C-alpha cells in the first residue's frame, strides 16, 4: 500500500483558497463565492503533479478570535487540517494586502513545524507584483505569486510542493493486519 502526502490550503476568509483547491484538483468541487464563510468543513481532493500524487485539503477561512460558535468551529477545522497535513499552502490576498489575521495565521503555521509555502494570490497584473513585497514580512522562505482564477504561477507553486513530497515507498506488509474468510461449506466465501 502507498501513502499519499497531505497538502492543506490555509488562510483567512476570501483569499481564494477554494479557487486554488479547484485548480489543484482540476475540478470544480469546492463552492466558490465572494461571500465569506462558504467553506465550513475540511474538503478533500486529489492532485497529481510531476509524477507525484497527493491529497489536498480546502479549509474555511481562519477568523482571528472567532467569537461565535460558527467561527470557532471553522477555526477548529483549520487546526485539524494543519495537524494532519505534511505541507501547508498559506494563501494570502494581494488585493486586500497584509493584515493582522495574516500575521496571526503566520505565527500559528511557524509553530506547527510543517513545510509552509506562501501563495500570494490575485497577482494578475504588474502593479500587484510590486504589492507582493509586503508579504515577505511573514518570514516564509518559499513564496509564490499566483492567480488561482487564471492559473498563473500555480505550476511553479506545484513544482515546489512536490519537492517536499517523498518518493513513493511501499509500506512494510509485515505490519498490515491479516484476515481470513471463514464459514460453512457452500456459504459463499469465495463470492
Locate predicted features.
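Polar low-complexity intrinsically disordered regions
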Residues: 1-2, 17, 127, 132
Amino acid at each position: 500500500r502507498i501513502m499519499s502526502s497531505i497538502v492543506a490550503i490555509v488562510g483567512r476568509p476570501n483569499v481564494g483558497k477554494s479557487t486554488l483547491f479547484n485548480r489543484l484538483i482540476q475540478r470544480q468541487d469546492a463552492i466558490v463565492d465572494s461571500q465569506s464563510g462558504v467553506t465550513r468543513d475540511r474538503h478533500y481532493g486529489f492532485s497529481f503533479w510531476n509524477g507525484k500524487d497527493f491529497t489536498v485539503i480546502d479549509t474555511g477561512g481562519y477568523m482571528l478570535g472567532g467569537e461565535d460558535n460558527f467561527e470557532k468551529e471553522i477555526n477548529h477545522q483549520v487546526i485539524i487540517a494543519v495537524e494532519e497535513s505534511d505541507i501547508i499552502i498559506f494563501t494570502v490576498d494581494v488585493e486586500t494586502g497584509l493584515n493582522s489575521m495574516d500575521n496571526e495565521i503566520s505565527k500559528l503555521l511557524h509553530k506547527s513545524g510543517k513545510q509552509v509555502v506562501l501563495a500570494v494570490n490575485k497577482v494578475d497584473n504588474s502593479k500587484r507584483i510590486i504589492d507582493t513585497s509586503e508579504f515577505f514580512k511573514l518570514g516564509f522562505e518559499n513564496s509564490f505569486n499566483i492567480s488561482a482564477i487564471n492559473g498563473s504561477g500555480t505550476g511553479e507553486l506545484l513544482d515546489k510542493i512536490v519537492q517536499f513530497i517523498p518518493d513513493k515507498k511501499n509500506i512494510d506488509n509485515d505490519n498490515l493486519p491479516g484476515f481470513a474468510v471463514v464459514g460453512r461449506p457452500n456459504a459463499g466465501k469465495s463470492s
